[in-house]
Regions:
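Conserved SAM-binding loop of SAM-dependent methyltransferases across substrates and taxa
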Residues: 224-236
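Conserved SAM-binding motif I beta-strand of class I
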Residues: 238-243
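Non-catalytic substrate-recognition/targeting regions of SAM-dependent transferases
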Residues: 99-112, 128-197, 206
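Conserved class I S-adenosyl-L-methionine
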Residues: 214-223
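C-terminal catalytic and target-recognition region of SAM-dependent MTase-like enzymes
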Residues: 281, 322-387
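Non-catalytic accessory regions of SAM-dependent methyltransferases
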Residues: 1-115
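S-adenosyl-L-methionine
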Residues: 245-286
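Mobile active-site "lid"/loop adjacent to the S-adenosyl-L-methionine
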Residues: 248, 283-312
Length: 387
């Protein structure tokens, strides 16, 4: 088996599973992109095997500490383990993330379940090569009627992979209506954002909605309206939602009608909306923006963006208002995000206390030693009157 030898002090020597290009001392056996390679230290000790791609900044991703090939039995076993974990954890098996990349030992593989449909992404060269085998294993293990390939994520560019959307097994289901936390959503597995719905925020909708009764709510970066819908159904006195994307605005309005709730929907840039002088006060403001950075090298700009966003939002918060805010970039550490939030609140001259932190649900598990698997950070803050 071809392979790589890593430099001293490489992260993989300390529990990480990735090998960056700068950490490779040398290669041997002429490894080919998409192949399984041996990963060794400078003393020729095997550290495990990983998938290889010289076109990616992450040249190797370890998926086993022992010698292991990628074959049908391997994929079936890993997917069975992923499904069993979620079932034992009490996850809702008809609406959840079935496979979450490195967190389930399948680097680059994402599989989301929407009733009878499974939506699959294979965002690494090796896994993309085996996508039909993976799809067959998913259908066999879950009993899904169809498996849809949604390989249109921008992360594929860094892997040198083409964009592709197709039905791998069964027939295209068309838009599906799903229910989550008492809220009905229309999901389009073939054309919706990402795989169709933000499954990682379903629990957060309920948490935030628990504070919405009797409050005027502003949901920023509303997307399909998850937070806005949950707050409206929970008894908010009014709900306003701001979203810039026309497709999302259309979906949001449709979901509001589907759930029989009144939401004031504004198609606008959130930063522009927040800085307008005629904005009213709100008792509950939700900030759930898309990732501000896809690269660690842009972290300073991202943190400035978070600081500015929270400074603007805090100025619209009522005396005893609540702010629920989220960051979905794994490049931004939790402490960095909290510091940016605190700086923004300071700019707005607002003192706030932390009510709770919100993390990823159990169907998006975090691997110790691999901080990149922990991307979702949430804070619920309450304004301190008289400060």
């Amino acid at each position: 088996m071809a392979g790589i030898i890593v430099r001293p002090r490489s992260r993989i020597l300390h529990g990480h599973d990735w090998v960056y290009a700068s950490e490779i001392l040398k290669t041997f056996g002429a490894p080919v992109d998409g192949d399984v390679v041996s990963i060794k230290d400078g003393r020729d000790q095997l550290l495990g095997v990983g998938i290889y791609n010289s076109r990616s900044q992450i040249v190797a991703r370890r998926f086993s500490r022992r010698r292991q090939d990628l074959d049908a039995d391997f994929f079936r076993r890993r997917i069975e383990q992923a499904v069993e974990y979620r079932r034992d954890a009490g996850c809702r098996m008809d609406l959840c993330r079935l496979v979450w990349s490195e967190s389930d030992g399948l680097p680059g593989v994402i599989a989301d379940r929407y009733g009878a449909a499974v939506v699959l992404q294979t965002n690494t060269a090796a896994m993309d090569r085996h996508r039909e085998t993976i799809a067959a294993a998913l259908a066999e293990i879950t009993g899904a009627a169809c498996v849809i390939e949604r390989n249109d994520s921008p992360v594929r560019v860094s892997e040198g992979l083409e964009m592709r959307t197709a039905v791998l097994i069964g027939e295209a289901p068309g838009p599906l209506e799903v229910e989550a936390g008492g809220i009905r959503f229309l999901v389009d597995p073939l054309a919706g954002h990402k795989t169709g719905l933000y499954l990682d925020q379903i629990e957060s909708y309920g948490i935030v909605a628990g504070m919405a009764a009797g409050r005027a709510v502003l949901d920023c970066f509303s997307n399909q309206g998850g937070f806005a819908l949950a707050c409206a159904k929970a008894g908010a006195t009014s709900v306003s939602a701001v979203e810039s994307g026309s497709g999302c605005v259309e979906a949001l309005r449709g979901n509001a009608a589907r759930n029989g709730v009144a939401i004031e929907v504004r198609q606008d840039d959130v930063f522009d909306f927040l800085k307008r002088p005629d904005r009213p006060e709100y008792d509950l403001i939700i900030l759930d923006p898309p990732s501000f950075t896809k690269a660690r090298g842009k972290i300073k700009e991202a943190l400035r963006g978070y600081r500015d966003l929270h400074a603007r939002a805090a100025q619209l918060l009522s005396k005893r208002g609540v702010l629920a805010t989220f960051c979905c970039s794994h490049h931004v550490a939790g402490l960095e995000f909290e510091e940016a939030v605190a700086e923004g609140l300071g700019d707005a001259r607002r003192n706030m206390r932390l009510l709770r932190r919100i993390g990823q649900p159990l169907d998006h598990p975090v691997v110790m030693g691999l901080p990149e698997t922990e991307y979702l950070k949430g804070l619920v803050l309450e304004a301190m009157p008289g400060r």
